[in-house]
Amino acid sequence: MNKLTSSYSPVHVIGGGLAGSEAAWQIAEAGVPVILHEMRGVRGTDAHKTDSLAELVCSNSFRSDDATSNAVGVLHAEMRLAGSIIMRCADLNQVPAGGALAVDREGFAEAVSAAIAAHPLITVLREEIRGLPPKEWDLAIIATGPLTAPDLADAIRAETGADALAFFDAIAPIVHADTIDMDICWHQSRYDKVGPGGTGKDYINCPLTQEEYNAFIDALIAGDKTGFKEWEGTPYFDGCLPIEVMAERGRETLRHGPMKPMGLTNAHNPSVKPYAVVQLRQDNALGTLYNMVGFQTKLKYGAQGEVFRMIPGLEKAEFARLGGLHRNTYINSPTLLDQSLTLKSRAGLRFAGQITGCEGYVESASIGLLAGRFAAAERKGASPAIPPVTTAFGALLNHITGGHIVSDDEPGKRSFQPMNVNFGLFPPLDPGALTRPEGAKRFRGKEKASAKKQAMASRALSDCATWLDKNLLIGGAATR
C-alpha cells in the first residue's frame, strides 16, 4: 500500500505494544505521519511469544466494561469516545467473560497489527532503538513497556539521573478446554452476571472442599519456585501477585481473593456450598483455551503441573501455556514528567504506557492515547490540551505526573507506585451532587457508595465528551 506524504514532519514512537500502537494511531488520525519502531522481529523479550503489535502477555481480560459504576469501564468508554484503535479491536475480538471485556488474544493482536500496517500515515520499522532518540527526532514517544531492552533502559537512567524502579509481574497458565473434567466443573459467571457478549455462564468453575483447599495451599507453598537471582528485593505490584505469594500471606487469603466461592452454585451439587472455587476464563474466540483467573505464578514448570492438577476437574489438564515471571520497570514519573508526559529534562520527548507507572492494559493504552494526542497537537503548533481530572483520562494522568509526591522535608517520604485506574484517583463530587432515593430520608447500606460511583462515572463521561469536542484533532493535509 502506498503511504501518504504530509506537510508535517513525522513523530517517532518507540515500542509497538498497547501504548505505542495507540499513540501512533492517534497521531496518524490527526493527520501527522508516524514512524513506529518495534524491536520484536529483530529481538525478542522474555514474555512475548509473537512479533504482533499489541500482544497481550498476561491475562486476556480488559476487566470490567461497566461504564456506569466502574472506573475501568469508564476508561473503556472514554477511549471509545476518543477513537481508540485498541478498544475498537478489543470489541471486534471479544470473548464471553461475564461482566468483563475479554478478547481472543491472537485475533486482537492481529487486528491491531493490520490496522496499523494499513494506515497511510504510519510506517512500521522493525529495529531495536538502543539509546534515547537522536536530537533530530524533535518529537518522540518512548512506549517500550515493562520489558524495555537493557541498552535503552540504561540510556533512560543516564538521562534522568535516577534508577528506574522495578517490580515483578507474573503470568497465569492457560489450559486446553477439552482436558477439563466437566463432570466436576460447571459453567457460571459470579452472581450469574451477564457482560458484553456473555451469557451469565462464561467461566468454568472448579470446586474445592476444605480438605482439598488446605492440601492445595500446602502444596502451593512448598512448590519449587523460580529463583530471584539479581532481582532479590524487587517489590511485586499488588494487582498481579503470584498466587503462592498470596498463599504465604495467610491460609485464607486465596479463599477471600481469586478462589472466593461467593456468588457461585455447584451445578452438580447445588445444596453443598464449595469451600473455595478456582475460575477459568475463556481465552480465545473458539473457546478451546481457558486461563486460570488470578493464578499468575512463579512456580517452576514441573511444580505447576503437579500443584495445579490437584485442583478438582484439572487432574488431567493439559496446559497450552504455563505461568511465568518477569521483571517490569517504570520511571519515577511524578518527578520526571510534566503534565503532557514530556520529560522535564528534554523537550519533545514523551513517555507512555506501563513504563510511566500505570498498571493494566487499558491504562497503558490510554496513556499512549494521550501521549499521541499531545504530540500531534504539538506538531501542529498547538498546546497539548490536558483532560479534566474529573475524567478517567485526567485522573490517571494526574496520578502519573503528580501522584505520590511528598516534600523532601517531610518524614516518611513515599515512593511512586504503579496503579490501576480507580475512583480513588478521581476528585470528590461537589456538595449536593448525590441525590437520595425517591421517598427516602437517607441512603441505606451500600446505596451511597453505589450512587457515588455512578455520579463519578456520569461526570467523567460528560466532562470527557466536552473535552474531546473542544479539542478535536482534525486530520491534516496529506497527499500521495
Swiss-Prot record:
One biological process term in Gene Ontology: tRNA methylation
GO molecular function: flavin adenine dinucleotide binding; tRNA (uracil(54)-C5)-methyltransferase activity, 5,10-methylenetetrahydrofolate-dependent
Keywords annotated in UniProt: Cytoplasm, FAD, Flavoprotein, Methyltransferase, NAD, NADP, Transferase, tRNA processing
Species the sequence originates in: Sinorhizobium medicae (strain WSM419) (Ensifer medicae)
The family this protein is said to belong to: Belongs to the MnmG family. TrmFO subfamily.
Residues that bind FAD: G15, G16, G17, L18, A19, G20
Gene3D superfamilies hit by this protein: FAD/NAD(P)-binding domain
One Pfam family per UniProt: GIDA
Name the UniProt record assigns to this protein: Methylenetetrahydrofolate--tRNA-(uracil-5-)-methyltransferase TrmFO
Catalytic activity field: uridine(54) in tRNA + (6R)-5,10-methylene-5,6,7,8-tetrahydrofolate + NADH + H(+) = 5-methyluridine(54) in tRNA + (6S)-5,6,7,8-tetrahydrofolate + NAD(+); uridine(54) in tRNA + (6R)-5,10-methylene-5,6,7,8-tetrahydrofolate + NADPH + H(+) = 5-methyluridine(54) in tRNA + (6S)-5,6,7,8-tetrahydrofolate + NADP(+)
Subcellular location: Cytoplasm
SUPFAM superfamilies: FAD/NAD(P)-binding domain
Documented EC number(s): 2.1.1.74
Role: Catalyzes the folate-dependent formation of 5-methyl-uridine at position 54 (M-5-U54) in all tRNAs.
GO CC aspect terms: cytosol
Cofactor(s) of this protein: FAD
Superkingdom as given in the UniProt entry: Bacteria
The keyword S-adenosyl-L-methionine is annotated on this UniProt entry: no
